[in-house]
Regions:
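Flavin-dependent oxidoreductases
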Residues: 20, 180-182, 189-289
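Glycine-rich FAD pyrophosphate-binding loop
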Residues: 26-49
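Dinucleotide-binding Rossmann-like beta1-alpha1 core, especially the glycine-rich loop
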Residues: 53-128, 139, 256-257, 266, ...
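Short beta-strand to alpha-helix junction loop
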Residues: 62-73, 97-107, 143-163, 315-326, ...
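Helical element adjacent to the flavin cofactor pocket in flavoenzyme catalytic cores
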Residues: 142-199, 203, 207-210, 388-400
Length: 404
């Protein structure tokens, strides 16, 4: 017999955005019954727990984008949350360096974008780099971002989950669900139960577009996962103490291989951005799911017809970086303070689940929020989603009529 359960709000997905949404709803509506449901055994198993831990400053994003709207404020609020809860944040700052003369104009454009976004940022001459990060190297100019920092994603997600339950929120794990239409209302169907809610929030990360399609939303979108692999080594004297990033390649929709310092005195290099089939394909065939072949085929077929990204070139250039030596050589263009002979171990990889628009033939780069019937769908909460999570969630709660 199928049991019907009733809630005020049900959130699908116990990542940092799903939990932040639950906290925001309980902050504004403390008497409401709110459930967060997830197919895993604990919060933040995938994107939220496997991201780089970098609190981005907010200068990469187009000034009219949701990413620009929330990243700077999210940086401040996530740091405040960490400080309030005695969680470590390493205020490393970041330099963005030029690898050749062609990067200089793009660097200056990046700086202007940061100014437009109200970010604390400096454009400096190469002779000042030794003062800020002597291990880095640049051509002509570089950007200094003092507010970029590093936190521990797993510790932060755990503390947020504790806050949600302390406020009266409920979790249900080990629960795979699907959305079903019934009498102009969407219900959540699980194994032996059905959930009814005044409002549902689909915050299922890589699976959000799949769930949305079950109730007729977002058929123009497919998910294309990109594998972000890293290598790590013990931090040694002479390694960069700041994060060191390249100027992003305009034909590659990602930030490029960079160096990141961890809270456990390690330095890591990466990530790659290699297109894969599986939404949980963290190793070559680990997590491969043949059911996801269709979306991979549709996404890559669409992008092959597009001038927006060279998907074949991207796959080739990123695939070679899955091997240790080419990845380290790429990072050494940013800093000479890396030794190929150091012990470089694999660091837990992540998946960046990008949405491809089949109609416009582009990889969607901004957050996408759609609502229909009694469901709000968060379809593209990619980087800097972790940094932006608190103000982004507040904006969703305050601006989606279904949640008010």
């Amino acid at each position: 017999m199928t049991e019907l359960e009733n809630y005020d709000y049900v959130i699908i997905g116990a990542g940092i955005i799903g939990i932040s949404l639950g906290i925001e709803l309980l902050t504004q509506k403390p008497t409401k019954k709110i459930l967060i449901i997830d197919k895993e055994t604990r919060p933040g198993v995938h994107a939220s727990g496997r991201n780089s831990g970098v609190l981005h400053a907010g200068f990469y994003y187009s000034p009219d984008s949701l990413k620009a709207k929330f990243c700077k404020q999210g940086n401040l609020e996530l740091k405040k949350f960490c400080n309030t809860n005695n969680l470590e944040v390493k205020e490393t700052g970041k330099v963005v360096v030029c690898q050749d003369k062609n990067d200089v104009t793009r660097l200056m454009n990046l700086f202007e974008r940061g100014i437009a976004n109200g970010v604390e940022i400096e454009l400096l001459e190469s002779n000042e780099l030794s003062r800020i990060e002597p291990a880095a190297q640049t051509v002509d100019k570089f950007i200094w971002s003092p507010t970029t920092a590093v936190g521990n994603p797993k510790e932060i997600i755990k503390k947020l989950a504790d806050k949600f339950t302390d406020m009266g929120g409920l979790f249900r794990f080990n629960s795979r669900v699907k959305l079903i239409n019934k009498n102009n209302e969407v219900l959540i169907e699980g194994d032996g139960y059905i959930l009814s809610a005044t409002s549902i929030i689909n915050s299922a990360g890589a699976y959000a577009s799949e769930l949305a399609k079950q109730v007729g939303v977002g058929h123009e979108y497919v998910c294309l996962p990109f594998l972000g692999a890293y290598r790590k080594s013990e931090f040694v004297a002479g390694n960069p103490k700041r994060l060191v990033y390249p100027v992003p390649n305009p034909i590659n929709p990602f930030l490029g291989v960079h160096t990141t310092n961890t809270l456990s005195d390690e330095i890591k290099i990466g990530p790659t951005a290699f297109p894969v089939i599986g939404k949980e394909q963290y190793k070559f065939l680990d997590g491969f799911n043949a059911k996801e072949l269709r979306d991979f085929y549709l996404a890559t077929k669409t992008l092959l017809k597009s001038d927006s990204v060279n998907i074949l070139g991207l796959a080739k250039s990123e695939g070679i970086k899955l091997f240790k030596r080419p990845l380290i050589k790429k990072a050494k263009r940013l800093t000479n303070a890396l030794d190929l002979n150091q012990k470089w171990e694999n660091y837990p990889a992540g998946i960046r689940a990008q949405i491809v628009n089949l109609d416009t033939k582009v990889i969607e780069m901004d957050y996408i929020v759609r609502s229909d019937k009694n469901v709000v769908h968060i379809l593209n909460a990619v980087s800097p989603g972790w940094t932006s999570s608190i103000p982004f969630s507040r904006w969703i709660v305050e601006n989606q009529p279904l949640l008010n």
